[in-house]
Every structure is written in structure tokens, then in C-alpha cells.
């Protein structure tokens, strides 16, 4: 088998994501005609320390959100350097782009430009070798199907309602397989829709396919989800668990947390106690961004209070960045990292963050963004690294369902070799 195959063309274009905003798509062609294509996602609530998503800023086109500058960077600066390189050397490709950019946060070329190229190269390499992407990235031991962390009620920046916390999710950790987990979530989703309708609530959906009703409180969202779980014939806390993403950086003002929908302003200590109360009342298995990205003291309080029994995921806190993750590990805050490819900008750096987390006993949850495309890379990535958990929205809206359908295909391909770990995926807590 050849271990060297040249890149002969790198080409980017502007396409639309699921939120009707432009994003970058990249094609990489090899000397034998093999092609790899990747599209880049985009977030609505973004961490302050994420790599830069390069936008044009021309208000007369796409309200300033065009990505033609990033596209041009791919078609000129990046292409000029990568053409002739070996597509099978992912580390060298990503290192070359990082050096070309020369900034700490990808501000020159744009993380959206670099990620599109990085992923398209990996896909082209996998296609050339005749391998599935998860096998190419993960090797012979890539086999773990993830527990879905499925967003079924949206609030915060993902919806136009009065719910402060951004995401209320279900996790079918009691399922025997991924396909059964997906079925369970689908049935709960339908049960939730009928439950909301019966209580007079709107069943319009948010960016990620979850319902976005004007509930009376954040706690009511949990209560109505538990009703739906039971209505679908499952047991909360045994078959299906609750996960939250408050996106607390979005409600952090002057050192306190503003739950405007409930008319409450809480100190970090009070916010931690708020989560403690919720975790004692309901089967909550995971809380993402429970504290703001720079509230390290609040994170420490929260971790000390419930970090042994609830997965505490750092998203804005860590932004898939090994430097921030290393700080968190040293301080003993959180016990899990959310992995978003476009927060850091290359596949290599993403894999480094996952490896660092797992070595420290932290779990890694591979995630979509609110602005998605039909690209299914994260489905392959989560299996490649045996992460065991994926967050990619409700079982509705085709850009979300595309990832779940790809996981069904992977499960089928792995057959008896595939493994669904369920509760064992939460090795960072006592469950």
C-alpha cells in the first residue's frame, strides 16, 4: 500500500449552515483523483477563548457574516502551501497551517478556513485508503458507539423564549445499544411534543431541533421531560437520565448569575447550591458549563459539591484547548471536556485535547454546534476516539439526524465488534 499520495488541489467555497448563515466548505483532491469534502459548523453561544471564526464584516452581504475572506485564504495561502504534501501525514498538514497562521487563536487565516482543510484532508486520506473515516482516525480499536446527549428543550441563545438555561437533554444510558438508545430518544421526543401540546405550550423548535416553549421556570423544563420519559414507557434515572447545559457565561453579569426568566440573581455559591438541589431532586447525570468561563472559583465550588456524582462538562471553560484544559486539571475543576472541532481549528489539536482529558480521568463529549451542515465528521470522530458520548441535538432537523444516521451505519458496520457502554461511559463519576 502506498504511504505517500500527493495533494493536487485545495478548493473552498461559501455555503449555508442550518441557521441560514454562510460557512466554509472545502474540497481536497489527490493525485489519483480521490476527493475529500468537509463543511465547517458555527456556534451561537461562543466561548471568549475559542479560535477565531473569520467573517467578512460586509453588512451589505449576509449581514456581515460572509466567509469569503476565509474561502480566499484556503484558495490562496493554504492551497499554495499544501499542494504537493502527503495527505496521509495529518500532523504535518495541520502543523503547516498552524505555522502559516502564526497567531494563538487562528486570527489570520481563520479557524473556519483551517478546520475545513484539516477535515477534508482526513476524509480524502480515508477515501484513498478505502477506509471509513472513524477507522482511519482511530485505528483498529475504534469501536465504541456513543450515548446520545440529546437536546429536546431549548432555551437561552438557542431559542426565543423565557427559559434561562440553554439546553435540557436526555441521555439513554440504560439502553443496550446505540440503535435502541436512538429509538428511546425518538419516542421520548414524540411523547414530549404531545405532553407540551396537552398543557397548552407551543411546540416550535429551536436551532438544535428541541422544543422551545415559554415555560414558567427552568425546573418546569425538567419536570415536563420526566413526564415525557414516563409517558414513553421508560424509567427516569434507570433507562434515561437528564443532562443540562445552562451556558452560564451567557447569564454571568458582574460576578453573579442572572436567571432573568425567574427573577433571581445568584452568587456563584448560590448557583452551585441551585444545581445541588436539582441533582438531588431529579436524575441529572451531566451539567455542562454550570459556571461561567472565567469563574474558576465558582467551578471549584461546584466541582467540590457534586463532582463525584455528576459529570461536569467544560465547554466555554476549556474550548477544546489543551492549555485551558491543563489549567482545569491542575485546579481540579470539572471532570469532563466538550469537544468542538471548530473551537480549536484542526483535527490534530482536537485529538490532543481528547487524549489529555482521558489521561487525567476526564471524559470527552464530542459535540456539534448550533449552526450545522449535513457534514457527519463528528459521528466518525466520536467512534474513532472511543469517547462514548455525543451531543448533536434533537432527533429532528436533518443536519442533526445526519449524525445519528451515520452512527447507525457505523454500528451496522462494526456489528458484533461495536460496543455501547451506557453508564460505563461515565467513568469520571460514581454511577
Curated annotation (Swiss-Prot):
(2R)-2-phosphoglycerate binds at residues 166, 340, 369-370, 391. GO terms for biological process: glycolytic process. Keywords: Cytoplasm, Glycolysis, Lyase, Magnesium, Metal-binding, Secreted. GO terms for molecular function: magnesium ion binding; phosphopyruvate hydratase activity. Belongs to the enolase family. Catalyzes the reversible conversion of 2-phosphoglycerate (2-PG) into phosphoenolpyruvate (PEP). It is essential for the degradation of carbohydrates via glycolysis. This is Enolase. It comes from Clostridium botulinum (strain 657 / Type Ba4).
